[in-house]
Amino acid sequence: MGRLTVNLAGVTFKNPVMPASGTAAYGQQMAQQLDLSALGGLVIKSTTAEPKAGNPRPTTAETTAGWLNAIGLKNPGIDNVLADKLPWLATHYPDLPIIGSVAGASFDEYVAVARKMASAPNVKLLEINISCPNVDHGGLAFGTDPATVTALTKAIVAAVDKPVFMKLTPNVTDIVPIALAAEAGGAAGLTMINTLTGMGIDLATRQPILAHGTGGLSGKAIHPLAVRMIHDVRQHTKLPIIGVGGVFTPADVLEFYLAGANAVQVGAATYGHPTACTDIIAGLPAAMDQYGITSLQALIQEVQG
């Protein structure tokens, strides 16, 4: 096993760095800017049962220390992803592990999309985006209620034959009960954290800077929050954790590992710097040398036991 190699729920990744869902879409555009085969894995855009047009523009805005986005789950739908997007990745990058991100507005939609996503041979893990509003319960996000998280996780796990990672929302009073609810439902791992709900207002127009009003805050501003939440959850579970939130440098990666992560995703850093993922991968060995880390597996053993 190499210095950077990690294992997530039985799936081997040659390094721990992958773009967060949405930042690489389905890989085709990012492939024009960097060698996707250098990535540890690729998380595709959150996909729903039917195509979604997304929210009206503007959908993104830069803030003091990050980005606000309200894309609205814009995607071509699972049937297109199975027929076009995933086969393209399988043809051009046959050895690249794909993490299929699943979204939905109901239990039935989540299960149906997860079942289809899991049927793709190059999808090795499923990541379930539970920040979506539950249309059957007044629009409350699925990921804010422990009982709902357990029930949804159970339903998806029962329907698929691939490991299921639940992507946790930080927009809760305490994220630990949500993580434990996912574990109780049979999750193979956790991805954390999703964006924090934020807002910006244009002083000249007196209107929100995003057409949707609110949006998800990502970037350097949320990194300390992600570190704290990963640390808190790690005290209560042995499940593998994919850490996400303000990762810009190799040092950020190692900080997540010290908090209890097993792998990382890079989101906002790619907006102004498309090669952020591969640059971080290239810089990891030197950062590990600087801090006396022989391998990531050894660091996981040191931190997690």
Curated annotation (Swiss-Prot):
| EC identifiers of the protein | 1.3.98.1
Which BP terms does GO give this entry? 'de novo' pyrimidine nucleobase biosynthetic process; 'de novo' UMP biosynthetic process
- Per the Swiss-Prot or TrEMBL record, the active site comprises 132 (nucleophile)
Instruction: Cite the Pfam families for this sequence.
Output: DHO_dh
Task of the protein: Catalyzes the conversion of dihydroorotate to orotate with fumarate as the electron acceptor.
UniProt catalytic activity: (S)-dihydroorotate + fumarate = orotate + succinate
Q: Which compartment or compartments is the protein found in?
A: Cytoplasm
GO CC list: cytoplasm
The species this protein belongs to is Lactiplantibacillus plantarum (strain ATCC BAA-793 / NCIMB 8826 / WCFS1)
On subunit structure and binding partners, the annotation says: Homodimer.
Per the entry, the cofactor note is: Binds 1 FMN per subunit.
CDD domains in the cross-refs: DHOD_1B_like
* Residues holding FMN: 21, 45-46, 129, 167, 193, 219, 245-246
What residues bind substrate, as annotated?
45, 69-73, 129, 194-195
InterPro entries xrefs: Aldolase_TIM (IPR013785), DHO_dehydrogenase (IPR050074), DHOD_1B (IPR033888), Dihydroorotate_DH_1 (IPR024920), Dihydroorotate_DH_1_2 (IPR012135), Dihydroorotate_DH_cat (IPR005720), Dihydroorotate_DH_CS (IPR001295), Dihydroorotate_DH_I (IPR049622)
Name of protein: Dihydroorotate dehydrogenase A (fumarate)
Cofactor(s) recorded in Swiss-Prot or TrEMBL: FMN
Family, as annotated: Belongs to the dihydroorotate dehydrogenase family. Type 1 subfamily.
Please name the GO terms that the record assigns under molecular function: dihydroorotate dehydrogenase (fumarate) activity
Which keywords does the record carry?
Cytoplasm, Flavoprotein, FMN, Oxidoreductase, Pyrimidine biosynthesis
Pathway given in the UniProt record: Pyrimidine metabolism; UMP biosynthesis via de novo pathway
